[in-house]
């Protein structure tokens, strides 16, 4: 449990300082939404966690998209869906979050090209809709 807490604290610090580099970020709201997502995840309220992580992403939290991607890879609270996982990792990678980039590239090795293209299209739509259309 302590190791998990340390990892979460490290991710929070990395995303906080990474978010500062992007300017148009509401760090306080992003971190609050992300923390609520972590609480929901800890309580196994996975759909609520996704909603909070999406809100955190909309406020500029760099790590939140990776957490959503992990839920889709593992099928926690949602059906396993590598296309949606790739979409969320792509969103994080586009913002400069290294974990998202690494995870996106990892799952791409087991995806077909059509699914990857669809995921990229979905990521673009999600970002352009300000995270309202992310399915």
Task: Name every feature range the model reports, one short phrase each.
Residues 26, 30, 101-135:
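Terminal, low-structured helical/coil segments at or just beyond the last alpha-helical repeat
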Residues 56, 71, 92, 107-110, ...:
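TPR/TPR-like alpha-solenoid repeats
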Residues 64-66, 78, 100-102:
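TPR alpha-solenoid repeat register
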Residues 24-26, 42-46, 58-59, 72-80, ...:
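Short coil/turn and helix-start
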Residues 9-19:
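Bacterial N-terminal signal peptides
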Residues 31-42, 65-74, 105-108:
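Hydrophobic face of amphipathic alpha-helices that form TPR/SEL1-like repeat modules
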């Amino acid at each position: 449990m302590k190791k998990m807490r340390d990892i979460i604290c490290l991710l929070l610090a990395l995303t906080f300082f990474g978010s500062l580099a992007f300017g148009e970020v509401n760090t306080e709201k992003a971190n609050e939404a992300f923390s609520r997502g972590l609480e929901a995840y800890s309580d196994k309220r996975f759909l609520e966690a996704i909603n909070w992580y999406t809100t955190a992403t909309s406020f500029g939290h760099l790590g939140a998209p990776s957490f959503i991607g992990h839920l889709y890879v593992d099928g926690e609270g949602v059906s396993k869906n590598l296309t949606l996982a790739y979409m969320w990792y792509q969103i994080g990678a586009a913002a400069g979050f290294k974990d998202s980039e690494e995870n996106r590239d990892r799952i791409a090795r087991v995806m077909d090209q059509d699914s990857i293209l669809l995921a990229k299209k979905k990521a673009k739509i999600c970002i352009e809709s300000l995270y309202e259309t992310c399915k």
